[in-house]
């Protein structure tokens, strides 16, 4: 007797025909002439490569030939032999971190504090500039590290290729809606600013006073 293995997966209280739950399966088409048009292939299993810190894993980023991992209250580097190296301590909370890089500097925004690891000099440091207001998320665009200030509408940029230096006037406000910013990303050369009720899209205008500017009409209500 043939049992159809393709189609919808469901679980019901009362089932007349079948009751199935498909886990870790994906469809694969059978070449023309096969007995069935397709079948469900099992997904490859996972293999433990290494253990990084004590957890939880709060962020991962690949830079060059290394994997940089924030686990618990520390930053680690993992090489291609899965050897784990401790690089420095960050604030020990469980919230996810935001990570960005410019090829040589890895920047980690840790729900307020921000840290920088220089891959060329192997120096790890916290941003202590007196004008630094704290950072929720961080991204990289055209030489600037772009970050949003906690509990505010403000988006900031660091000095050019220097995430340890912050000018007190290098910020602007996402004011199309009076909501605070909660996240941000850089995608296709644009800065997406996510508020609790709205999304704004900015770009690098090259202006001397502040490089970022909102794209006209690029505003969405959530």
Positions of the model-derived regions?
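N-terminal beta-propeller domains
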Residues: 1-84, 135-196, 200-202, 206-207
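Intrinsically disordered, low-complexity coil segments
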Residues: 32-34, 53, 89-92, 120-122
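Surface loop/turn motifs at the tips and blade-to-blade linkers of beta-strand repeat domains
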Residues: 49-53, 87-92, 127-131, 172-176, ...
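A broadly used, surface-exposed interaction patch
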Residues: 80-108
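Hydrophobic or amphipathic alpha-helical targeting/insertion segments
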Residues: 98-130, 138, 146-147
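Blade-edge beta-strand/turn elements of extracellular beta-propeller
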Residues: 126-127, 202-221
């Amino acid at each position: 007797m043939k049992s159809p293995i393709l189609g919808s997966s469901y679980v019901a209280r009362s089932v007349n025909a079948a009751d199935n739950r498909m886990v870790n399966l994906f469809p694969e088409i059978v070449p023309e002439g096969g007995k069935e048009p397709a079948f469900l292939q099992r997904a490859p299993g996972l293999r433990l490569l290494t253990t990084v810190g004590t957890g939880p894993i709060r962020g991962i980023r690949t830079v060059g030939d290394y994997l940089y991992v924030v686990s618990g209250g520390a930053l680690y580097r993992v090489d291609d032999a899965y050897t784990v190296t401790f690089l420095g301590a960050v604030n020990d909370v469980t919230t996810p971190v935001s990570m960005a890089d410019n090829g040589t500097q890895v920047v980690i925004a840790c729900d307020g504090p921000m840290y920088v690891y220089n891959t060329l000099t192997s120096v790890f440091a916290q941003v202590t500039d007196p004008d630094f207001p704290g950072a929720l998320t961080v991204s990289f665009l055209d030489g600037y590290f772009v970050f949003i200030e906690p509990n505010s509408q403000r988006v900031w940029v660091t000095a050019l290729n220097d995430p340890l230096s912050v000018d007190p006037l290098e910020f602007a406000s996402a004011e199309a809606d009076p909501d605070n910013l909660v996240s941000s990303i850089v995608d296709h050369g644009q800065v997406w600013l996510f508020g609790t009720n709205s999304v704004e899209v900015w770009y690098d205008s090259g202006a001397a006073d502040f490089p970022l500017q909102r794209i006209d009409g690029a505003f969405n209500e959530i």
